[in-house]
Amino acid sequence: METLSQDSLLECQICFNYYSPRRRPKLLDCKHTCCSVCLQQMRTSQKDLRCPWCRGITKLPPGYSVSQLPDDPEVIAVIAIPHTSEHTPVFIKLPSNGCYMLPLPLSKERAMLPGDIGCRLLPGSQQKSLAVVTIPAEQQPLQGGLPAEAGAEEPDRRGVVKSSTWSGVCTVILVACVLVFLLGIVLHNMSCISKRFTVISCG
């Protein structure tokens, strides 16, 4: 594999999107890496996966999906490194009880540990107005194993296709309505202009 910078190691070199739980870094037989979404798109147009760089072929047995290809362990190791500092604790104010919570490590299901374990009260003078920040799944670091959503990659993709198809249909209908409206205005103005000339010439 070529020598890549740290940033280019974190993104798919086909679509230039960062790797995420939805865009997992998949290792081809030739040892090149692509995201699972790009490989899935390649798979729809060809039987076997052909590497875009070296043209090496990765054969998938019948019934195998792209999600069953191995993850690239080097990329997973880089992505899984936590980026928070031990010297800057973050407290989150819980709206339900006014408690300030120190976030604890996430479980495999990406859920906070339950109960008072994660709740640390601060003295009144140190309490600040903080809000919970939700990190999109695209930007969350990958864990070592496959996420629970990996098996649901196909239905998720179908939902996106249905959604984009529906928005395309709505766009076409909206454009057609606007064109009919504008045509109506033009025809109305033309009929008014022709009547005005008729009245003037007759009168």
Curated annotation (Swiss-Prot):
InterPro entries noted in UniProt: RING_RNF152, RNF152_C, Znf_RING, Znf_RING/FYVE/PHD
Pfam family, one: zf-RING_5
Pathway the protein acts in: Protein modification; protein ubiquitination
Gene Ontology CC annotations of this record: lysosomal membrane; lysosome; organelle membrane
Superkingdom to which the source organism belongs: Eukaryota
Keyword terms: Lysosome, Membrane, Metal-binding, Transferase, Transmembrane, Transmembrane helix, Ubl conjugation pathway, Zinc, Zinc-finger
PROSITE patterns membership: ZF_RING_2 (PS50089)
Gene3D superfamilies assigned: Zinc/RING finger domain, C3HC4 (zinc finger) (3.30.40.10)
Name listed for the protein in its UniProt record: E3 ubiquitin-protein ligase RNF152
